[in-house]
């Protein structure tokens, strides 16, 4: 146990415990049209929430993920995070127009 604590402290990148019933892995973020960021995540434990999508990042294929959603992050609260956990959210309209590879991806606003 002491070894894991020392290792965690030495790495300075240990993840916080998940505080929410829905767990996601952050893929990347893009500037949002109205300010803030759109955070693209893969939902790890609630498969009915996202869509299987092949995503592009800066014009290049980033990968195919099973349960993609976009989290609206107007205050950049989730900058530099590897995962986002939450229980309450509002679902916004799915992406339309713009990048065709993103069409239909559900958008969420996390309410904690």
Please state what every model-predicted region is.
Residues 1-15:
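Sec-dependent bacterial lipoprotein signal peptides
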Residues 91-112:
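OB-fold/S1-family single-stranded nucleic acid-binding modules
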Residues 64-86:
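Short nucleic-acid-contacting surface segments enriched for D/E, G, S/T with interspersed K/R
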Residues 51-65:
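Short, basic/aromatic beta-hairpin or loop at an interaction surface
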Residues 47-54, 93-94:
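Short, cysteine-centered beta-strand-loop-beta hairpins and adjacent loop/turn segments enriched
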Residues 45, 88-90:
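A mature extracytoplasmic/lumenal domain signature
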Residues 17-49:
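Structural detector for short beta-strands of small beta-barrel domains
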Residues 13-19, 84-86, 98-102:
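Sequence contexts marking disulfide-bonded cysteines in secreted/extracellular proteins
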């Amino acid at each position: 146990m002491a070894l894991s604590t020392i290792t965690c402290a030495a790495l300075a990148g240990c993840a916080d415990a998940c505080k929410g019933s829905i767990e996601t892995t952050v893929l990347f973020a893009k500037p949002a049209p109205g300010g803030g960021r759109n955070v693209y995540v893969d939902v790890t434990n609630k498969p009915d929430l996202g869509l299987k999508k092949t995503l592009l990042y800066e014009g290049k294929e980033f990968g195919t993920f099973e349960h993609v959603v976009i989290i609206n992050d107007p205050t950049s609260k989730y900058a530099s995070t590897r995962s986002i956990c939450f229980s309450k959210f509002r679902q916004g309209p799915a992406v339309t127009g713009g990048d065709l590879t993103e069409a239909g991806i559900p958008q969420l606003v996390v309410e904690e």
